[in-house]
Structures are given as structure tokens and as C-alpha cells.
């Protein structure tokens, strides 16, 4: 695991859309994560961790 991935994982736990944004930009992954985070914090975290570590 690289340092960048570690930082993205930490950011995904603190603020899920930010971690996804740093990895993918404003693509569909970011918007899905943002919507899931608005529906509930836990779904946003789970999706962000899944998509970053995939």
C-alpha cells in the first residue's frame, strides 16, 4: 500500500467524497459517493473504502 492510498483511505473515513475525489476526480464514482454520504454517513464510507481499495 502506497502513502497516497493510505491518505485516501484516511480521508475516506473522515470525509468519504473527498477521498474518492482525490482518486477519481468528478467522475461518476464521486457523485455516487456523495449521494450515499448524503443518505447516510456509513454507506458513504463503505462505498468510498470499496472503490478506493478496488
Curated annotation (Swiss-Prot):
Localisation per UniProt entry: Membrane
GO cellular component: membrane
Top-level taxon of origin: Eukaryota
Induction: By low temperature. Also promoted by abscisic acid (ABA) and dehydration but is not a general response to stress conditions.
Entry membrane topology: Multi-pass membrane protein
Pfam families, sorted: Pmp3
Transmembrane segments: 2-22, 32-52
Keywords in alphabetical order: Membrane, Transmembrane, Transmembrane helix
InterPro entries in the cross-refs: PMP3
GO BP terms: response to cold
Family recorded in the similarity comment: Belongs to the UPF0057 (PMP3) family.
Name listed for the protein in its UniProt record: Hydrophobic protein RCI2B
Amino acid at each position: 500500500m502506497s502513502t497516497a492510498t493510505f491518505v485516501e483511505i484516511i480521508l475516506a473515513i473522515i470525509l468519504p467524497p473527498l477521498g474518492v475525489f482525490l482518486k477519481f476526480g468528478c467522475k461518476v464514482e464521486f457523485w455516487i459517493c456523495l449521494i450515499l454520504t448524503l443518505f447516510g454517513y456509513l454507506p458513504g464510507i463503505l462505498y468510498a473504502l470499496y472503490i478506493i481499495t478496488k
